[in-house]
Amino acid sequence: STVVSSKEVNKFQMAYSNLLRANMDGLKKRDKKNKTKKTKAAAAAAAAAVAAAAAPTAAATTATPATPAATAAQ
């Protein structure tokens, strides 16, 4: 803790507030527009990847059934 005499309270408060203002740049909120665009693009890419991965399995399940001649040959 910092001990400040009653005569120097105003001086201390001014110096401390100036210090905080000088270092406030690192605390400013950042622009979130770019972040939402990136997350939407990432979500779309992930959805496309899931759809692409599911497509081959869907094609395999909808294949035409084997004919009796093809089954007998196996």
Swiss-Prot record:
Keywords attached to this entry: Cytoplasm, Ribonucleoprotein, RNA-binding, Signal recognition particle
Main location (coarse class): cytoplasm
Gene3D superfamilies, alphabetized: Signal recognition particle alu RNA binding heterodimer, srp9/1
Highest taxon above the source species: Eukaryota
One MF annotation (Gene Ontology) recorded for this entry: 7S RNA binding
Family annotation (Pfam families): SRP14 (PF02290)
Subcellular location: Cytoplasm
GO biological process, one term: SRP-dependent cotranslational protein targeting to membrane
One GO location term (cellular component): signal recognition particle, endoplasmic reticulum targeting
Function: Component of the signal recognition particle (SRP) complex, a ribonucleoprotein complex that mediates the cotranslational targeting of secretory and membrane proteins to the endoplasmic reticulum (ER). SRP9 together with SRP14 and the Alu portion of the SRP RNA, constitutes the elongation arrest domain of SRP. The complex of SRP9 and SRP14 is required for SRP RNA binding.
Protein family (similarity comment): Belongs to the SRP14 family.
Assembly description: Heterodimer with SRP9; binds RNA as heterodimer. Component of a signal recognition particle (SRP) complex that consists of a 7SL RNA molecule of 300 nucleotides and six protein subunits: SRP72, SRP68, SRP54, SRP19, SRP14 and SRP9.
Protein's recorded name: Signal recognition particle 14 kDa protein
Organism from which the protein derives: Macaca radiata (Bonnet macaque)
Source species taxonomy: Eukaryota, Metazoa, Chordata, Craniata, Vertebrata
Gene (UniProt): SRP14
